UniProtKB/Swiss-Prot annotation:
The fungal sesquiterpenoid aspterric acid (AA) is a submicromolar inhibitor of dihydroxy-acid dehydratase (DHAD) in plants and is effective as an herbicide in spray applications. GO terms for molecular function: heme binding; iron ion binding; monooxygenase activity; oxidoreductase activity, acting on paired donors, with incorporation or reduction of molecular oxygen. It comes from Aspergillus terreus (strain NIH 2624 / FGSC A1156). Pathway: Secondary metabolite biosynthesis; terpenoid biosynthesis. Coiled coil: none annotated. The chain crosses the membrane at residues 18-38. It is a single-pass membrane protein. The gene is astC. This is Cytochrome P450 monooxygenase astC. CDD domains: CYP503A1-like. Its EC number is 1.-.-.-. Pfam families: p450.
Length: 538
């Protein structure tokens, strides 16, 4: 076939496709509206639209992507604050019903068969495509192990993590006491936290394999990308888009599997020689992966001998362990450095570490000591208040008809409901100077609050790990983050080690001001490429 004939055929084919495409899209929309679209009640108002409007304008939909902070604040001021239910535009074709905080008790009291937390998270993360099956959230037994087993052994777990932090700081930050070094903060924190978390999840020596740590981060990044791209796609097209989006992710999971396989084979063989009811040997490793294998031996024997399944469960555990923690610690460091001139933040935190933990970097961290670090705690909670990555919480999917809100809105089956977080955390009626980062905002309140006969502060509900309907970074209720107590240890250990062993400052061109965070739709992300200067203390 000659070039001209090929060009003519291509042009004719392209013209035919151009004529067919609008018809195909139109048919897809008709099918979607007829069989898949959720029919919202007529009395449910739409955020950003006039009363009585039944569909979102393109302008309001676009605001979700370019001005979500203002859209959420407007929704809070006009609806949530007045006890009203409202519909918000979401990612892609998604809509979200936002409920007032007064409805939270009733929502959380509903059983999973009526309002499903698992189904809501599956919609957000799209695990069907990222990990190949929805069971990793629908049956999240590793999370149960964190809540029941690991939290009871926090001090022992954190001994290993603290040791790993020292190694990771030496490796990724350095030990030079003479020269300042400029580092990409987010990238450095990513590697340090993945190393520490891997000491908890897979133990030594795999936690020190940089190739393994980077493969884990590729998996995490792939999970996030899939949640955004596939989640934004109409349901009809997800079986096509999902596998395409996750091609590189599947390769990264295979890389993780290759690293994990030797310890998996070794440990499964050792377990096969024991009775599942036997207590672990005193010298048996106690990392999460070992706990997972022991649990699978007792309760999920089909998964025990399924390496791909166990590897994917480990990948999801890694994702839960490091994603939010990395963003939190990055923001904490930026906030500590930027607030130092006004609040003497670095010296105050160093003094607290000396007083509570002691000057020895090998001192043991205990629950009691961590609870006494109320200034570090305040720095963390204030960071979550202003810079939480997630700005809604308590997500549920409606599975039954007939559930009505207190303001008379019937929640349609298949709809997703949630509660706003950030607008409440920045409400000037609750917080003085709500958009100013005040590192010791919460510690001052706790220090001045009355105490009971056992010395407990009446303001202990303002601790970093405490949740409430007005403070949702960790969720609230029965599905609040089970790993937040481990995160409490981890972030305080990281900040303590950083400040006790390094001097930190911003590059001169920052003029003492932290770079601004950036909004990506409703997610608030640390500034990309933010740098700090760092030098080991003598």
């Amino acid at each position: 076939m000659g070039a001209s004939t090929f060009s003519q055929s291509f042009a004719e084919g392209y013209a035919a496709w151009a004529l067919m495409l609008p018809a195909l899209v139109g048919c897809a929309l008709l099918i979607y509206r007829a069989f898949f679209a959720i029919r919202y009640p007529a009395n449910l108002p739409l955020a950003g639209e006039p009363d009585g409007k039944r569909t979102f304008s393109w302008r309001t939909r676009w605001r979700y992507y370019i001005d979500c902070e203002a859209l959420y604040k407007e929704t809070y001021d006009n609806y949530t604050k007045h006890g009203k239910t409202v519909l918000l535009p979401g990612l892609g074709f998604r809509h979200d019903i936002v409920l007032p905080q007064s409805a939270m008790r009733d929502i959380m009291a509903r059983p999973e068969k009526e309002l499903s937390h698992a189904d809501a998270v599956l919609e957000l993360v799209q695990l069907k495509y990222s990990l190949g099956h929805e069971k990793y959230k629908a049956d999240p037994w590793p999370c149960m192990l964190v809540k029941s087993d690991i939290n009871s052994k926090l001090e022992a777990v954190c001994d290993g993590m603290n040791e790993e932090l020292k190694y990771a700081f030496d490796k990724y930050v350095g030990c030079d006491t003479e020269s300042w070094k400029e580092v990409d903060l987010l990238e450095t924190i990513r590697m340090i936290i993945m190393a520490a978390a891997s000491r908890f999840t897979v133990g030594f020596p795999l936690c020190r394999s940089e190739a393994y740590l980077r493969a884990c981060w590729k998996v995490n990044d792939g999970i996030m990308m899939n949640g955004g791209l596939t989640g934004a796609t109409p349901r009809l097209l997800r079986p096509i888009v999902g596998p395409l989006v996750t091609m590189k992710l599947r390769q990264s999971i295979e890389q993780v599997k290759k690293h994990v396989e030797p310890i998996y084979r070794q440990r499964v063989q050792a377990l096969s020689q024991q009775n599942s009811a036997e207590k672990p040997a005193s010298d048996e490793t106690q990392d999460l992966f070992q706990q997972m294998l022991r649990y699978a031996q007792r309760e999920r024997p089909g998964e025990l001998h399924d390496l791909p399944s166990m590897c994917r469960r480990l990948c999801f555990a890694n994702f839960a362990a490091v994603h939010q923690t990395t963003l939190l610690v990055t923001n904490m460091v930026l906030n500590i450095v930027s607030s130092d001139p006004q609040h003497n933040t670095i010296s105050v935190l160093r003094d607290e570490v000396k007083d509570v933990i002691g000057p020895d970097s090998n001192a043991k961290w205990t629950k009691y000591k961590v609870a006494q670090m109320i200034k570090s705690d305040s720095v963390a909670r204030e960071t979550m208040r202003l810079y939480s990555n997630t700005n809604r919480g308590v997500f549920r999917k409606v599975l039954v008809e007939g559930i009505k809100t207190e303001d008379g809105i019937e929640l349609p089956k298949g709809a997703y409901v949630s509660f706003l977080g950030r607008p409440l955390q920045c409400d000037p009626e609750t917080f003085e100077d709500p958009f100013e980062y005040n590192p010791f905002r919460f510690s001052r309140i706790r220090e001045q609050a009355p105490r009971d006969t056992k010395g407990r502060s009446s303001a202990s509900h303002l601790s970093f790990v405490s949740t409430s309907p007005e403070h949702l970074p960790f969720g609230h209720g029965g599905h609040s983050c089970p790993g937040r107590f481990l995160v409490d240890f981890e972030v305080k250990m990281i900040v303590a080690y950083l400040l006790m062993n390094y001097d930190v400052e911003f590059p001169a061109e920052y003029k003492g001001q932290r770079p601004a965070n950036r909004w990506m739709a409703e997610a608030l992300m640390p500034p990309s490429g933010a740098r700090i200067r760092i030098k080991r203390r003598s």
